[in-house]
Amino acid sequence: MGHKFLNDAGAAVTEMLEGFVQSHPGVKFLDGFPDVKVVVRSHVDKNKVALVSGGGSGHEPAHAGFVGDGMLDAAVCGDVFASPSVAAVLAAIRHVTGSPGCLLIVKNYTGDRLNFGLAAERAKLEGLNVEMVVVADDCALPPPLGVAGRRGLAGTLFVHKCAGAAAAAGEPRSWELGVRAGREGAHSTSKCRHTRVAAASFITCGAGGLCASFVLCTMVD
């Protein structure tokens, strides 16, 4: 296991985000921090399509590290390996969304899809134009493996960048031009179909203060 400096495992995400915001002048916290862990751009442009992403913490620089020009307008951060709440996602949508609308970029995990999806539906009831794209790029879990199918991994970054560049250029339908995704069903949810990632690790992971979640086998002669 790698060594980490933690004052308190229970406050690790809050302290990490505080340090990040203090060292990056272009971002700030949304009102309600730390109960609502949302990092937004210091100056939000509501004349373009807004991009919002997020998920469980523990995979830095995701997601706050991708907030900035030509990228995300807001990152919604959950606890370690835990999805952010519906209330936090909805607060982010409300803060950054103008008349051009908002795109939620979500990785294919059950909690993320559920909470971002519920927040999107509530935002629509408030009259906001919200779309959601799901990134499922994991080569290790092709269908029918895995309960929820392919996970969303590092390929999500390319979706951030493609959609972010289109939004910054003023494209009115950045989710179509940046993501090249096809519509699925009647839930305003698209799936990014052309990104694949094979992930590997040299060490196991574990939430702060807990044992490793699994053991890597070692090769012997």
Label every model-predicted segment.
Residues H59, G68-S99:
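Glycine-rich oxoanion-binding loops at beta->alpha junctions
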Residues R113-G127, G146:
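Short Gly/Thr/Asp-enriched flexible loops that form oxyanion-binding sites at enzyme active sites
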Residues M1-A50, H194-R196:
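N-terminal amphipathic/basic leader segments beginning at the initiator methionine
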Residues V135-S174:
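Short alpha-helices
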Residues A167-D221:
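Mixed-charge interfacial surface used for oligomerization/domain docking
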Residues G2-H3, V49-G56, L72-A75, G101-T110, ...:
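Short glycine-rich or small-residue beta-strand-to-loop segments that form or flank ligand, phosphate
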Residues E60-H63, V86-L90, G111-G117, A140-P143:
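Short glycine/serine/threonine-rich phosphate/pyrophosphate-binding segments
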Residues M1, D45-G54, H63-V76, A140-P143, ...:
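Gly-rich Lys/Arg/Thr-decorated short loops/hinges at beta-loop-alpha junctions or inter-strand turns
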